[in-house]
Amino acid sequence: MAQQSMKVRPVLLKRSSLESVELVKQPHHRRSKSQQVRFKEDGNIKNPTGVTEVNTQTPEDPGVMGKAQASRHHHPTTYSLSFPRSHKAGGFRSISIQTSPSLRKHFPVFKRKKLTTSKSLVEMPTASPSAIQVNGNLSEQDIVSSDLAFLRLAQHLEDGPRRLKIPHPFLPRMPKVQSNGPVSFCLESGTWMSSEKATAAIQVPDDICHSPTWEARESALSPESSAEESNSIPALISMCPGDGQRVMTSELERMPPCSNTNSSASNMPGTEKLTPELLLPKDNPDDKDLGLPSSQSKKMCVPSPPRTHSSPEPGSRSQPVHLGRSSDCPASGDNHQDLESLRSSSASKSVPVCWEHVTKLPSQSDTPELQTGVGSEQLPASIPRQENRAQSSREIGGSNHSHLAQGELCDLQGRLQSVEESLHSNQEKIKVLLNVIQDLEKAHALTEGRNFYRTGQDLNNCSTCQNTACIIYSVEYDFRQQEGRFHEVLQSLEEAEPTEEAPSPPKSPAEAPVPEKQDLRRKSKKVKKKCFWWI
């Protein structure tokens, strides 16, 4: 099977690379050969990274992706060694890590793109009249959230890495969405510059797209969300000039819960109600009406690279709100400059803050402080809980400290038992060895015609005594050594006994085997006297 796939694969690779127009050059064939060796054991036809773009693209625009691939070769400096994005090629998942250096150079630098907006975003062409210009001051969170908002229109979500193409009235091509690994926003550089199609690769964590609640919300809410989006986006696009379009659409897609209650997408003062209390079930009586929009906003607010997204349970309506966005939303009005400042402030929040407030939202929904605002009241509400936890931890620490002495005693008793067992086993070994020596001696005496024998009597003539005495001495030496360790343990126990008077009752059974040990030593001494009487 592997050999057949090896024979079939180069033909398919050449065909697909020819479909991507003559701009795809010879290096693609070299890379496909190296990758053919790499994926030989899979038995499934997997395309190399350079060709998967062509296969996942619709057959009507292979030339555009060919330009994109050609433009990659002109920007070798923007790539560094990083983990490859696994593409959905032919329905199969490539599971092996690409270690060849010629395959690694496609993948962009993530660190630089987290800090500043990438060149490819700023240099996006305005050739098509409906193309959206991106302001250089925008954070990548805006682009991620606005692009991910269209994910809810896709009803053919599958498990594993996926690339979706969804049409949109303002974009000629919907950005491709790929879910694998951590949330990171990476743009194939040169694609925006060389083509009119906006193709971005957004990596979404697996727990978002794979969780049943995500897919349930996806299937249940896609008709409503599509209708709402068709109403909302044109209204705000008409409000804002060129560079502000992206800002307002992304902002609107975060705010449909409150604007939906007024049944008007352009009613922006309704956003002054968008505080996390709307999304908590016990604070707002109107939440029954807002249930679907709140869960819908869960879908749209997919965090940017520095954040993590918790897939909430269906029962809890609490949205994983970014703290900056939730606390700043009441101040947002009609002007998009405030919204830009909100984006920059919310983008600066770190992961622990987000997680802290996500975990606190459902648990503290009963406290009245939340109704005045999350940013100012949540931390004081959490202070008494932390004090209670600290007190309980102190009590547990005290009880652990009291139990510590008993634990050490149990440990010492266990060591004592192990030493006793080793002593018993060594004594049995000595007895067995002595019996073996006596049997050998008896056999020697009978063969030599002697009717008498004493163990170790004939050291000069008896080869058995000469060969086995060292064994007996070595066993005896080990026995003495372990006996010395046993006495050390006993002394440590006796020293610990006057200092700790409380654990003295459980100590008494541990002292019981001591006379037995003395009896055993007496017996072993008698045996030694019998065996080594000449010493």
From Swiss-Prot:
Compositionally biased intervals (Polar residues): 46-59, 258-269, 307-319, 361-375
Spans annotated as Disordered: 23-85, 215-346, 360-387, 493-528
Domain of life: Eukaryota
Coiled coil (residue ranges): 411-448
Keywords: Coiled coil
Pfam families: FAM196
Membrane spanning stretches: none
Keyword Coiled coil attributed: yes
Compositional bias per record (Low complexity), positions renumbered to this chain: 219-232
Keyword match Endoplasmic reticulum: no
Family: Belongs to the INSYN2 family.
Protein name: INSYN2B protein
Organism: Mus musculus (Mouse)
